Amino acid sequence: MSCGGGDDEGSEITNPCISDQIFSQSRGDCNVSLSFETIYNENITENSRIISSNSIPNHIVGLFGRVQGALNPNPISEQNLVYTLPISPVSAKSLIPLLGENGPNYSFGIMLNGVELDPVAAEPFPHEGRNSPNANWEWNLEATNTPLGLDCNNGHVQPSGKYHYHGPPISYLDNLDLSLDRMNLIGYAADGFPIYYKYAFSDPFDETSSIIEMTTSYRLKTGIRPGDGISAPCDEYNGVYVNDYEYINELGTLDEANGREGVTPEYPNGTYYYIITEEFPGIPRYFRGIPSDDFNFRE
């Protein structure tokens, strides 16, 4: 990327800075059936929900591994994972971001099929690698809007062989045959709060109220990024970077963590809960509670 040039006095102002990052929501085909059996177990103790998983999805996936046409070179392999979550999570004093000053700190949570929700890419500007001394994590690529080798489920594979979702897990959700007239529990966040898909009560504290689609309070910024194309990206806001979006309080039905307080079928006395939405952020980027270290990349 580069910026340069100027405007003659009285001429129309133009944007001389062009980004080389392409907006793309293309996905790889899902036509691979895995030979592994999906393992997901929960053990409830007095204070904890202990989940064990092998991270193998219970649906078809894209082609991964060192074969022609693969979406990335990492083959899917079984994992041996254990997560300990609080049964009665509490809110932190302030929201805790998944992305830290030096890169991703946490994955967000786990689906009821044992696959992690891991929305944050490790792709900081100027795209020289996460360990580059020039890495600007304020401008990190949005995985669902850039060609990072995701399959039709918004998933791909880490070098360890762990399959994970960067966006709404399409095939998993389709296979659930979800009801449109009730709230559907689909997983748990790293802080222990439940995750639901898309729909919730119109009155958050009235379980007899109608079910409606939840809406995010994020929107795409307008105008041109302030960067020079060298230390920070330039060109128009288009969703390629997470920072292309802004949170507007009460723009939608959900808060900055893409959740809200209310009653649910599983929590009739009320709880905080997250919603997976179709629109950005899709998978939340903040925790309302204190995340388990089992989801911490730096532990």
Report residues per predicted region:
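Extended, compositionally biased non-globular segments
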Residues: 191-193, 197-299
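A mature extracytoplasmic/lumenal domain signature
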Residues: 89, 121-123, 167-169, 199-201, ...
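Short, flexible domain-boundary/linker segments around small modular repeats
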Residues: 112-153, 228-260
